[in-house]
From Swiss-Prot:
Residues 8-26 have a biased composition (Gly residues). Its main location: other. May regulate intracellular cholesterol transport. GO terms for biological process: intracellular cholesterol transport. HEAT repeats lie at residues 620-659, 984-1022. It comes from Xenopus tropicalis. SUPFAM superfamilies: ARM repeat. Residues 169-180 have a biased composition (Polar residues). The gene is relch. It comes from the Eukaryota. Residues 43-69 have a biased composition (Acidic residues). This is RAB11-binding protein RELCH homolog.
Length: 1196
């Protein structure tokens, strides 16, 4: 069992026992407990020492480092030895000798009890000493020596090299440790008491209570070492050893359960326990080596002054009183040594004063040269060393501190006997309440605040970004200063005084929280120390701890770490950021936990403003590119994209433009939607801003994306890759705000745009809602006020002065728009997704560039292409452009961007003209259908579309009326039932009585769609009556096209229609049509009807059909259809035969199951009764196995 750490005992001072007889007076080996009692000190000396120990007790109790150093006062050894030898000879020299009895001349010699106790302890006669202590305690004459010895549990935890009586020639090399008391050196009382699983670490009940007094056990239980909670490192190490032991002994299930209960630890790697932590032997080896366990000696040990055994006379020799001459000689030696001490102290004071003067000169020079990158961390030591003079103890050796760079912590380790300088500073800062202004710090203040340390300069990019765009770009940095801890992190100090104040504010929060996984509380301390520490190796270690502080940091914890990194960078400058922070990022770029890689990706963007410009465009860009290409986690790549956007706001090397473009294409093609979204929100706008400055937006970026779309259309003649088309087109759409900003910034009126007088207001709906602040035109320009002035001049210029000399706008009008319209004409109109994407693009383009631009520049170019006039109608081939995607994109993307009355009239007129021209030219209606489908998704256009269709219903041409009837089928699905009842059904009823049979036939699909979607019974009855008239009116008996259309409609809507409509109307009429088709004499018509009937029956076979309908209509209809297929299509006849057989089996199964159903009811009742009786009998049994077995015996 490990001994208590030096310096951590209750006393806090160091003590020890001099080993071996042959040694000289001097330093004793390492002590296992700082509160050990030196049996060679007198009572008065112990009291002095104890007083000093009490002053240091609180500080030493909290010390967790096992490497504390306790240097001792350099007091001449002879002084202490002579004082002890004079105890009985001259009581006048040492009046405070405690309970010793001075010998008077002529009296027989009497041994002092204190000397007896010292001898017993030295000879390890502990039981005798304990008995003596008990008797003295009962008589009221307690010896401090025995009291202190037995109250210190550390004296009973030392391993023994040999039992008492063996190896009596113990030397100083053994450390002078006391041997273990045999009564408690047992396994159960020692190791289980300290290393039990009990969270309170209380002493095991199996300690030999009869051999240890009650007070000793109480002291032992209340020892700080026992009550100290287990450290995280200790817990992980023990968990690992326990799991390893379980696996070696094939306790795999127990190991799995143990691993699940400790899921925060990786049991496969020892390195997960702790960095640079050596792995101990397994549990079995530790148990076997328990008897040989000894306290591990430390590199720097506690030191005490002792006396060689040879200098102590045996008890019998004490009776021999030394002669007076010898006493006077010893007194002279003591006086001489004391004079030397006084001289040394005087010399030390002079040197300290000289050191103080030199340090003040150094501090003044450092203030003058504050532009240096590394803050000087040498603490002033003059006050600290001067306080040593007044507080040093007589029992220790004087230690001269010559290292002017010693840290306050290091001094505390070397000088435990003096009050540390840090403690009073922290104590004072605790009395000062934190400023309430710290809680009001916001992220914008943190981002825009200049460096708080004079002389720190950062590379400013040679860019022309507006401050608003710059601020919006930096808003994506993952920082937070809106909380107490965020304020602490962002306000790190740059001087020793500031560090001390920070410690005073943060320590009260760290102490209660650090054991509850609140490790982010440590970030201010780590950062302050890393900022001010003079040694680069120590700074690297601290930053490594910062990045590894939390195993898997969540979003809030990452924000705290990144906020601290930015504050650190603002204080130390770009050189140290490059040398110290970036290597930490590089180390974790391939970490197994995505949260760590996410921290790296976010830090690259947050640190971008504080890095040298060469590093931004080389190392950091390469790191982010590697993570974008290789990382498999979507959230990591998303953070990479945002950091790339921030980097793009600071790169000013034109050679990196092409690399940025390749990264942009890679990001746009990422399979993760969140990565693509981050690209449109951050990366693309930031890259576009750089492209604008380089003048490449209109010369390279947009033309390149357009050429890729054209290439895609050429390669996709047999199948368009809609995903890539969406990727490039969405990128163009995100570039529209940047393109408009370029047009405004390069306009002829730019010099006139000055903020004077009242600034005009921008309409709320003037621009489409941006998906990101970086796509807001006002942000790109600089402010809404500046944009308002530019817009006013822009509209005036377009309306009155034109575009002469306006190169950027002329490029849009003369190159961009014609190329886009040409691309639109090559889009397949049946590709709904492509039509929708281009419609959104033109809608945003027109809304961004304004109504005047749309009316004067965009619409004329479309109208020139479409040429909507009756003289252009070609009845043989039709108008080719009207059948392309140009029609729906113009209608839904351009004509709908403004919703005033005149705009709606223009849209209605355009759709009416298209419907008329397509109908009269017998052209396909796909373009018109695409327009209706796209507009029908918005309920605001339903009335408008019904107006267009009513125009077709009352048109003089039967072709137009027929087209209107077919368009109703598309509109019914999205229109509410009120409009269907008021507008759609009356129009269809009108068309169903049209003189032209083709018009009447065209209404059938629309009636069928109503039956499929509407739930109002009145409407359904009206539709049912109209369809019945088509089927039963003799004038339609020979209308082959009508019959075909009705059968096709039944097959489409039958499975989704109301069951009553399907059972009462659809199936009986299909049976009738199948029977009539058997008498058809024309084979072509007979086969056409039969084919449509086969498709309708195949669709309806999946529906539930009652037995009556199956027998009366479904099966007879299938048999009639099989008769047709036997003669006309044998391949269909095989399928029909299997369908008929399957239906017949279903009917037979239902017939057979009916009588079985009544029997099954009776059987279920019997089984329930049997089950009840069985359970009742089972409940009457006891747990006897024999009685339970009797239940299942056969009756005889």
């Amino acid at each position: 069992m490990a001994a208590p750490a030096a310096g951590s005992g209750p006393g806090g001072s160091s003590g020890g026992i001099t080993g071996g007889a042959g040694g000289s007076l001097g330093v004793v080996g390492p002590s296992t407990s700082t509160s050990s009692v030196n049996p060679f000190l007198s009572d008065s000396e112990e009291e002095e020492d104890g007083g000093e120990e009490e002053e240091e007790e609180e500080e030493d109790d909290n010390e967790e480092d096992d490497e504390d150093v306790s240097p001792l006062n350099e007091r001449p050894a002879a002084s202490l030895a002579s004082r002890y030898l004079q105890d009985e000879a001259d009581s006048t020299l040492l009046p405070s000798a405690g309970p010793r009895l001075c010998l008077q001349p002529g009296e027989p010699g009497r041994v002092p009890l204190d000397a007896v106790a010292a001898q017993l302890l030295r000879d390890q006669l502990l039981l005798t000493a304990l008995e003596l202590h008990t008797e003295l305690l009962e008589s009221g004459r307690e010896l401090p020596r025995l009291r202190d010895y037995f109250s210190n549990p550390g004296n009973f935890e030392r391993a023994t090299a040999a039992p008492p009586g063996f190896g009596g020639n113990t030397t100083a090399s053994t450390g002078g440790q006391l041997n273990r008391a045999g009564s408690i050196s047992t396994l159960d009382s020692l190791d289980f008491a300290r290393y039990s699983d009990d969270g309170n670490r209380e002493t095991d009940e199996r300690v030999a209570e009869n051999e240890v007094p009650l007070q000793e056990r109480k002291n032992y239980k209340s020892s700080p070492e026992i009550q100290e909670p287990i450290k995280p490192l200790e817990k992980r190490a023990l968990n690992f050893l326990v799991n390893e032991y379980l696996l070696k002994n094939n306790n795999k299930l127990t190991s799995i359960t143990f691993s699940d209960e400790n899921d925060d630890q990786d049991f496969e790697l020892w390195d997960d326990v702790g960095l640079n932590t050596p792995k101990p032997p397994d549990l079995l080896q530790l148990y076997r080596n328990l008897s040989n366990h000894q306290t591990v000696s430390k590199d720097v040990a506690d030191i005490a002054v002792g006396v060689i055994e040879g200098d102590l006379e045996p008890i019998q020799a004490v009776k021999q009183i030394a002669p007076d001459s010898h006493i006077s000689q010893q007194a002279a030696i003591i006086k001489e040594l004391e004079d030397k001490i006084i001289l040394c102290n005087n010399e030390k004071a002079a040197l300290l004063e000289q050191i103080g003067n030199l340090e003040r000169q150094i501090e003044s020079l450092q203030k003058e040269n504050s532009a240096s990158g590394v803050c000087s961390a040498a603490p002033p030591t003059s006050d600290r060393l001067q306080s040593q003079t007044s507080e040093e103890s007589d029992h220790y050796i004087d230690i001269q501190i010559t290292d002017s760079d010693a840290k306050c912590e290091g001094t505390e380790e070397r000088l435990p006997f003096q009050q540390s300088e840090c403690e009073p500073v922290c104590q004072v800062s605790e009395d000062i309440p934190p400023s309430p202004e710290l809680a009001k710090i916001r992220k914008t203040t943190l981002l825009s605040a200049p460096p708080s340390k004079a002389g720190v300069h950062f590379d400013k990019p040679n860019r022309k970004l507006s401050p608003a765009f710059h601020q919006a770009l930096l808003s994506f940095c993952r920082m937070s200063a809106d909380s107490r801890l965020g304020s602490e992190v962002s306000q790190i100090a740059d001087s020793e005084n500031g560090v001390m104040k920070m410690l005073g504010r943060c320590l009260p929060h760290i102490v209660p929280n650090v054991l509850l996984a609140k490790r982010e509380e440590l970030i201010p301390l780590i950062l302050c120390t890393a900022c001010l520490h003079p040694e680069s190796k120590e700074r690297d270690q601290l930053l490594h701890i910062l990045f590894n502080l939390i195993k898997r940091p969540d979003d809030e914890q990452r924000q705290m770490i990144l906020t601290g990194c930015v504050a650190f960078a603002r204080h130390v400058g770009p050189t140290r950021v490059e040398a110290e922070l970036l290597p930490q990022c590089w180390e974790q770029i391939n970490h197994k936990y995505p949260e760590r890689r996410l921290l790296v990706a976010e830090s690259c963007g947050d640190l971008a403003p504080y890095l040298p410009k060469e590093i931004r465009s080389s190392l950091v860009l390469a790191m982010l590119q590697q993570m974008l290409m290789e990382d498999k986690a979507d959230m990591v790549r998303e953070a990479v994209i945002k950091s790339l956007g921030i980097i793009m706001g600071y790169i000013d090397d034109p050679d990196k433009y092409s690399q940025g473009f390749e990264l942009l294409l890679t990001a746009l093609g990422d399979p993760s939607e969140r990565v693509v979204s981050a690209t449109h929100q951050v990366f693309l706008p930031a890259y576009a801003a750089w492209t604008m400055e380089l003048g490449n937006l209109q010369s390279h970026l947009i033309p390149t994306l357009l050429s890729k779309i054209e290439k895609l259309l050429k390669e996709g003649e047999h199948g368009l890759d809609e995903h890539k088309l969406h990727m490039y087109l969405s990128a163009l759409q995100s570039l529209i705000p940047s393109l408009f900003a370029t047009v405004l910034q390069n306009a002829p009126f730019t010099s006139k745009a000055k903020l004077q007088g009242e600034v005009p207001q921008i309409e709320v709906t003037r621009f489409p809602r941006p998906v990101s602040p970086l796509q807001d035109v006002a942000t790109i320009i600089g402010s809404r006020e500046q944009l308002a002035v530019l817009l006013q001049l822009y509209d005036y210029q377009l309306e009155h002065e034109g575009t002469t000399g306006w190169e950027s706008l002329l490029w849009v009008v003369n190159q961009l728009l014609p190329q886009l319209i040409e691309i639109v004409g090559r889009i397949t109109v049946t590709s709904t997704a492509s039509v929708h994407e281009f419609s959104r693009f033109f809608w945003r383009l027109c809304r961004t560039f304004g109504k005047i631009f749309t009316n004067t520049k965009v619409k004329p170019q479309f109208q020139e292409i479409l040429r909507l006039s009756e003289e252009n109608i070609d009845s043989t081939a039709g108008n080719g452009v009207l059948t392309k995607a140009t029609v729906p994109i113009y209608a839904t993307g351009v004509l709908t961007c403004y919703n005033q009355e005149e705009d709606r009239k223009l849209l209605v007129g355009f759709l009416e003209d298209v419907m008329t021209m397509l109908s009269l030219s017998h052209a396909p209606l796909d373009s018109l259908k695409a327009s209706f489908v796209e507009l029908g998704t918005n309920p605001a256009y339903h009335e408008l579309l019904l107006t267009v269709l009513w125009y077709g219903v009352v048109h003089t041409s039967a072709l137009v009326r027929c087209t209107a009837a077919r368009m109703f089928e598309l509109l019914v699905k999205g229109v509410n039932e009120t409009l269907v009842a008021q507008r759609v059904v009356p129009a269809l009823i009108t068309l169903s009585s049209d003189p032209e049979i083709s018009v009447r036939i065209a209404t059938v699909p629309a009636f069928g769609t109503i039956m499929e979607t509407v739930t109002q019974r009145e409407l359904l009855e009206r539709v049912k009556m109209q369809l019945a008239s088509f089927l039963e009116d003799p004038q339609y008996q020979d209308q082959h096209s009508l019959q075909t259309e009705i059968i096709r409609t039944f097959g489409r809507v039958g499975p989704n229609a109301e069951p009553r409509f399907r059972d009462d109307f659809v199936l009986p009429h299909l049976h009738k049509l199948s029977f009539v088709n058997n008498q058809q004499s024309v084979d072509s018509k007979r086969l056409d009807i039969a084919t449509h009937l086969f498709e309708a029956y195949s669709a309806l076979s999946c529906c539930f059909i009652s037995e009556e309908l199956m027998m009366n209509h479904f099966l007879p209809g299938l048999r009639c259809l099989r008769t047709d297929m036997e003669q006309l299509s044998p391949e269909h006849e095989v399928i029909l035969s299997s369908m008929i057989k399957e239906c017949e089996q279903k009917v037979e199964n239902k017939t057979v199951q009916e009588p079985q159903g009544s029997m099954s009811i009776a059987a279920s009742l019997v089984s329930e009764d049997t089950k009840t009786k069985f359970l009742n009998k089972m409940g009457q049994l006891t747990t006897s196995g024999a009685m339970l077995a009797n239940v299942f015996q056969r009756k005889k």
